[in-house]
Amino acid sequence: MMQIPFTRIFKVIFVLSTIVAVTDCCSSRILLLREHTLKIVQHQHSHMHEHAHELQQQIQETAVELLNRLELQRKQLEASAQEEADQLHPDTDPNPDSGGQLPNADDSIAADPEQDGIILGSSTDTWLASESSTPITDSETVTTPETVTHTGEPPPDPSSSSTPDSTTPSPNDKETEIQMLPCSEAYNTSFCLNGGHCFQHPMVNNTVFHSCLCVNDYDGERCAYKSWNGDYIYSPPTAQRKVRMAHIVFSFPVLLMLSSLYVLFAAVFMLRNVPDYRRKQQQLHLHKQRFFVRC
């Protein structure tokens, strides 16, 4: 029967298990260090955002207080100006004798009947004259708003004005079509940040201008800024959680794959001497047959 070298098998298993243990230990230590570093960086970013938020609140409070002070000063100035105007121009009756003169005029009119007829005739004449002149003034007031421009310039002469087709260019002449083409793979992966979509615009002299279509309230040439209480603050792209994926990759599946690979190598190492063993067994069997035949 075939003698299996158990000592060699144990040596191979020990060496392979040592390699697996060292590999797993080193990978775990590296991943823990990376995770700790990422946590420190994220803590620093969150601290910076909190500090920026506090500064923004302080700036808003200072601005509101300053506006209140300015409004109070303006009201005080208006009140003082009103008091000075009241002191310079006191309330007085400009025509104190007008009330006393009216009864005298009525008495004089009632005393002279001939003057009443003259006054009535003159009033009818003035009323007719005003009635005849009223349509003219109405027509003037109606046409005035149509001719006055916003700049105060006189209206243009209708005879000198030309057709609008010959003087004013059509708005379609000023419109230019902008081509938006998708970017190359290198720009798609690295140019636009925070999930932005990259586009390229062909320019003159065979040059290409790249732009980003931002999402999630990001702004900027490369979508690197985000609105924070009305202001745009630089917000770098968040690091992807590759540590968790690395933990999964370098844990049980990798160990299983390495173990299978090591077992395969051990099987190849152990079974490569099988043909020699079989050849020896066959030779021994033939030798026994010859011995029995001779006997």
From Swiss-Prot:
| Protein's membrane topology | Single-pass type I membrane protein
Where does the signal peptide begin and end? 1-26
Query: What keywords is this UniProt entry annotated with?
Result: Cell membrane, Developmental protein, Differentiation, Disulfide bond, EGF-like domain, Glycoprotein, Membrane, Oogenesis, Signal, Transmembrane, Transmembrane helix
What transmembrane ranges does the database entry give?
Answer: 248-268
Q: Name one GO biological process term.
A: determination of dorsal identity
* GO function term, MF aspect, one: epidermal growth factor receptor binding
- Gene3D superfamilies to which the protein is assigned, alphabetical: Laminin
Glycosylation site list: N188, N205
Q: Where in the cell is it found?
A: Cell membrane
Membrane topology, Cytoplasmic segments: 269-295
Q: Can the keyword Membrane be found in this entry's annotation?
A: yes
Q: Just give the chief location class.
A: membrane
What does the entry list under GO cellular component?
extracellular space; plasma membrane
Composition skew (Low complexity), residue ranges? 140-152, 159-171
Taxonomically, the superkingdom here is Eukaryota
Tissue specificity: Expressed in nurse cells and oocyte up to oogenesis stage 7. Specifically accumulates in dorsal anterior corner of the oocyte during stages 9/10, at later stages expression is seen as an anterior ring. In stage 10 ovaries, it is concentrated between the oocyte nucleus and the adjacent oolemma. During vitellogenesis stage it can be detected at the oocyte surface, especially on the microvilli. It is also found at the microvilli covering the apical surface of the follicular epithelium and within follicle cells.
- InterPro entries on file: EGF-like_dom, Gurken/Spitz
Q: What does this protein do?
A: Critical for defining the anterior-posterior and dorsal-ventral axes of the egg. May signal directly to dorsal follicle cells through the receptor torpedo (top). During oogenesis this signaling pathway instructs follicle cells to follow a dorsal pathway of development rather than the default ventral pathway.
**Assembly and oligomerization:** Interacts with cni.
The protein's name is Protein gurken
